[in-house]
Amino acid sequence: MSVTPVLDPEWQRSPEGLDYLSRVLRHNKRKFFGLIERPVLPPHLPADVAAYKVFVCGKSGVGKTSFIAKLSGLAVPSMHHETAGIQTTCMYWPVRPSGSARPVIFRFQFWDCGEGALRKFDHILPACKEKADAVLFLFSFTDRSSFEDVPALISRTLDQDEDVTRVVIGTKLDQYMHTDVTEDDLRDFQRTWQLPVMRVRSVNGPRMTDGRDLDGRAGLAECAPVLNGLAEILWHRDQVIAGLVGGAE
């Protein structure tokens, strides 16, 4: 049975949607926002802001930092470096709820921490989970063990009674010649665990004509499926909590 989206999937391609998207760009490059910054909107572009804390976890080397860099418009690191302590990154993503004339700008605050810090300091995991709206469990398409470890990773990270949205993300989709995880594997996983699975490439997108800076618009288009998917899941959850739409049967 098909489910009607709670967010308009075509709005971002409209002139109005493109105007809102331009507010997270500067000279066709991505703007970067600090913890207390937000896009500046002119009076003719009203919008509400919906803030969400998202904890990104996974075994060392699956590409957590690269995943966040990709979504936020930063350059994907060329070499792996363990994240020291906790790192937070804010990004904004405009959407429009179905049946509404007023857009909503999602404020995603991604929390990332290194596996070594998690093992060494007992306070790291509780801090990352505190008031989190979603936990993203990452695996790499080039590392089958990271995929097979996802159920155990979920159990280690969350108790069964913790009411947090769970999403699985497959990274390094670009390295399809070296993939160790098949589409059949993903279908079996989704059928067994009833969790959404998304896919992301772990390489930089096109660059500007100067050859140095990343093309912001191209980067937004590349990340749109994951950002829209995450926004849809979280907005639907909030609508269910508010009693505005029905939950899953």
UniProtKB/Swiss-Prot annotation:
GO biological process: cilium assembly; exocytosis; neural tube closure; protein localization; protein transport; regulation of exocytosis; regulation of vesicle fusion
Annotated binding of GTP, by residue: G58, K59, S60, G61, V62, G63, K64, T65, T171, K172, L173, D174
This protein's record includes keyword Cytoplasm: yes
UniProt entry keywords in alphabetical sequence: Cell projection, Cilium, Cilium biogenesis/degradation, Cytoplasm, Cytoskeleton, Exocytosis, GTP-binding, Nucleotide-binding, Protein transport, Transport
InterPro entries: P-loop_NTPase, RSG1, Small_GTPase
An annotated GO cellular component: ciliary basal body
Chain residue ranges for the region called Small GTPase-like: 46-249
Main location: cytoplasm
GO molecular function, one term: GTP binding
Compartments, record wording: Cytoplasm, Cytoskeleton, Cilium basal body
UniProt entry tagged with the keyword Protein transport: yes
Superkingdom of the source species: Eukaryota
Pfam (any one): Ras
UniProt record similarity statement: Belongs to the small GTPase superfamily. Rab family.
Function recorded in the entry: Potential effector of the planar cell polarity signaling pathway. Plays a role in targeted membrane trafficking most probably at the level of vesicle fusion with membranes. Involved in cilium biogenesis by regulating the transport of cargo proteins to the basal body and to the apical tips of cilia. More generally involved in exocytosis in secretory cells.
Assembly and interaction partners: Interacts with fuz.
Name under which the protein is recorded: Ciliogenesis and planar polarity effector 2
